[in-house]
Amino acid sequence: MKLRPLHDRVVIRRSEEESKTAGGIVLPGSAAEKPNRGEIVAVGTGRILENGEVRALAVKVGDKVVFGPYSGSNTVKVDGEDLLVMAENEILAVIEG
């Protein structure tokens, strides 16, 4: 199954969770914080402006992004994988390099 987000929404595959702290302590799955990074796997057509024009999104498939800890509250399971669906304005930055 493939998701096609509408308008200014994007679908993100969350990065793998860290299971160790910086000090080397192994965290159980329930204590590990979910990462706020991921890769965009699908984008919508763009934001519809008040005048009816469509503004293309500033992100594209394959971009690695950072989002807020409470962003992407819409999680969808596709082919056994949890994907996040969020609006483009919930993305804080694109990771370059």
From Swiss-Prot:
SMART domains: Cpn10. GO terms for cellular component: cytoplasm. GO terms for molecular function: ATP binding; metal ion binding; protein folding chaperone; protein-folding chaperone binding; unfolded protein binding. It comes from the Bacteria. The keyword Cytoplasm applies. Keywords: Chaperone, Cytoplasm. One of its GO terms (biological process) is chaperone cofactor-dependent protein refolding. InterPro entries: Chaperonin_GroES (IPR020818), Chaperonin_GroES_sf (IPR037124), Chaprnonin_Cpn10_CS (IPR018369), GroES-like_sf (IPR011032). It is found in: Cytoplasm. Together with the chaperonin GroEL, plays an essential role in assisting protein folding. The GroEL-GroES system forms a nano-cage that allows encapsulation of the non-native substrate proteins and provides a physical environment optimized to promote and accelerate protein folding. GroES binds to the apical surface of the GroEL ring, thereby capping the opening of the GroEL channel. Heptamer of 7 subunits arranged in a ring. Interacts with the chaperonin GroEL. Belongs to the GroES chaperonin family. This is Co-chaperonin GroES. It comes from Pseudomonas putida.
